[in-house]
């Protein structure tokens, strides 16, 4: 059966070469190419330090990135709210399983982000000398798998691609992690694999709902008239599963441990891509496919988002371990995604999308710098890092730029995304004014804490009490050209989006507006309460056109 599938896919690819580029199977290639290429790595010689493997993996990652860019340029219409670049091949018809991929405004920016971050993660992994063949094999498997998560249009296939990420991440943590790597890897697999059962149960329930012949395609599920109780049950299960990945407090405890043991390239993939899978899935399934349940649970998302922002910011402030400090900072920033998804405004939901893209870039940059700093100082304790600013001036400049981006400095992407979320939620008349004021005021506390713990962190690392073992170490070198290049590649879109957010927002505005209208119609089923003001038309504000 699988051979027939790949034969069909190959014939279809050849058949489209004579047609327009919009008919080219861009997404299937971007998924299958890195995965297929990964299986060529075992044939590379074991001699040396893996130089050939590194260049091969980088070439594959760059080609994959160019393929996704080609998909966006040649086949994606930003004004079309529907799924585009659609490819559908019947795979296992008796099980209702179809190779169905496509992209709309919600998935396309994250597909581009995935291929971009992965290419930089491969470059960040250049110093890896231990088992380089296995390391880059796993990275390329993750590349194709993560793109598939955002591209598939079949819920059962989504579950399979979601699970595809578990083993590579587990091995990357367990083999190349720190002293407690086994504990961190085991905790990751227990949390993510355990919660994934809810995705499978929801997929089977939704696919078999009201029919004997299962159909798991998103388009079919979106048109199903699911009962309210059925939607609520599925919503709760999916919220738990996606809440682990986002992560939502209190389902977050695996993340600081994973980040505490991971290497820099794995950091970049965790913070830059893996967390975004949770936010994307909440939009795709909870908000889009289960609108009636979403209308009832949206206030809970707002509250959970505020808890994320405040709790994680306070915890980050108290951390003395550099990796864990940045990890909790990531959890705090993902709280804005929850608030945006819980809002019923186009502006707020657009802000959530932009926050995912923005944090993907900023989180990857900060964690790469954490790894680069650890490689030099051999410590993660802030108390032992003081006084290296004089010897690492370029590194200090890179840290400063990325920290300013993380604290949402105007002119950088984080500022625009957080402003959109705040404005969208506060101006959303679906919620009562007291609820909006209280939630926005509490979230503002987290915003105030962010520059405090980030700037104090910078001071402690570079200009704190001097550690003679570091300041007198002749091997303590400044940033290398490769490291400067990686940060420059990340800062360029961070600043570009901050100055002109329409670079990203235009790609998903049509899809987001359609999703919000769908959710607003579901608000009619929710009675007026101290939280809901009733069925008032939310202001469908568009993204700023700076």
Curated annotation (Swiss-Prot):
Keywords: Membrane, NAD, NADP, Plastoquinone, Quinone, Thylakoid, Translocase, Transmembrane, Transmembrane helix. It is found in: Cellular thylakoid membrane. It is a multi-pass membrane protein. It is an enzyme of class 7 (translocase). The keyword Membrane applies. Coiled coil: none annotated. The chain crosses the membrane at residues 24-44, 56-76, 106-126, 132-152, 156-176, 188-208, 232-252, 263-283, 297-317, 326-346, 352-372, 396-416, 437-457, 484-504. One of its GO terms (molecular function) is NADH dehydrogenase (ubiquinone) activity. Its EC number is 7.1.1.-. NDH-1 shuttles electrons from NAD(P)H, via FMN and iron-sulfur (Fe-S) centers, to quinones in the respiratory chain. The immediate electron acceptor for the enzyme in this species is believed to be plastoquinone. Couples the redox reaction to proton translocation (for every two electrons transferred, four hydrogen ions are translocated across the cytoplasmic membrane), and thus conserves the redox energy in a proton gradient. This is NAD(P)H-quinone oxidoreductase chain 4. It comes from Prochlorococcus marinus (strain MIT 9515). The gene is ndhD.
